Amino acid sequence: MENAKWLRWMVVFLGIAGISYLLYMNLNRPEVAMEPEDEKMLADKNGLVGDGIADDTAALQAAINEVPPGGTLKLPDGIYKVSRNPDLKAVTGYGESHFALEITNPLTIEMDEVTIKTETDGRYGIFWIHDTADVHLKGGSLIGDKFPRDAELTSNIAVLLHETQNSTIENTYTKNHSQGIHLHDADNNLIRNVTSEYNYGSGIINFSSNNNIIDSCVVRNSSDGHLSLYGVGENNTVVNCVVTEDRPDHTIEQGITVESEKNSRIENNTVSGFYYGIDIKNGAESNIITSNNVFDNEYNIAIRPGDGGENLLTPSHDIVITNNFATNPRGNSHFGIFVDIGEGHVITGNTVNKGNLIITDPKMFAKYEKQNSYVD
């Protein structure tokens, strides 16, 4: 009798344990994301052509809109022509911009072997990513059909990250836009392995945005500060980038600009071919410029008031310039490191040519002259 009672309780106990386990596994089962191949089928369903001739704007937008939040859209290989959508107008503190496509939900777009092209004279960009987070663009070439000679700085932006957080743009190529990548009031984002060239304005610009990382990017043959931190952003990092200008008739361009920026870091970049290589100006404060290789610029590294005109000429303070190679400025220039304004700067551990450390404040020059290295 006792054995039978014991067996009944054991059966009840095992049943409860089994049900509890099943409930636990069901409640804690991870979400199953759609496979990229499923997303490819979704894209095909929307009638993507990808021959570079047909207008794929509506089909691309439909495919983007059908991706569930957090899902992945893998675009089939091809060349996608897009046109200006009159309903997509971004208004920022930098100006107005029109676009072909918009993204307003978290998603990933994989664009291996994909080219999206615009007609430059239409004055529009490609992706307007706004009021969202966790958007990831991977791969792809975003190309205007010709250099935008009659553009404005915001008329043809390849990708605008606008009030968007925690997003990434990786392994993407842009060419022939007014700006390549523009971050505007966009925080905690990553721009990595992006190449942007032949822009009317900046290849990459971080405007009034914080805590962003620009890593291992190439910006070439653009303008207006090829890679620009501007508009009172804070705690941004530019690292491992190559910024260069090699057009013989472009001698007044700026490389990396740090303008009205605070507590940001410019590290281990290579900058060459500019009038101002690394250009700190207009109220920049407490930024670190370290371990960069800056050469063949009229001014390799400069702390100066600004460009004049409509720009502010506010002094910059507490800039740390340390452990940089700022040798061989172009032509007969002797401006390896040029410090013309501000207080509280730290200038140590740099290598320049003899006579190429120019600090206009005599006391500051006397303090730091022997804390740097000189080569012939």
How would you name each of these model-derived features?
Residues 60-69, 81-110, 116-138, 145-166, ...:
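Extracellular beta-strand-rich solenoid/capping regions of secreted or surface-exposed proteins
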Residues 333-376:
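Leucine-rich solenoid repeat scaffolds
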Residues 1-13:
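N-terminal Sec-pathway targeting helices
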Residues 71, 84-85, 118-124, 146-152, ...:
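Short glycine/acidic-rich loop motifs that flank beta-strands on beta-rich extracellular proteins
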Residues 27-39:
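Ser/Thr/Pro/Gly-rich low-complexity linker/stalk segments immediately outside membranes or between
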Residues 140, 167, 172, 189, ...:
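Consensus "Asn ladder" position of solenoid repeat domains
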Residues 43-76:
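Acidic Gly/Asp/Thr-rich repetitive segments characteristic of extracellular carbohydrate-active
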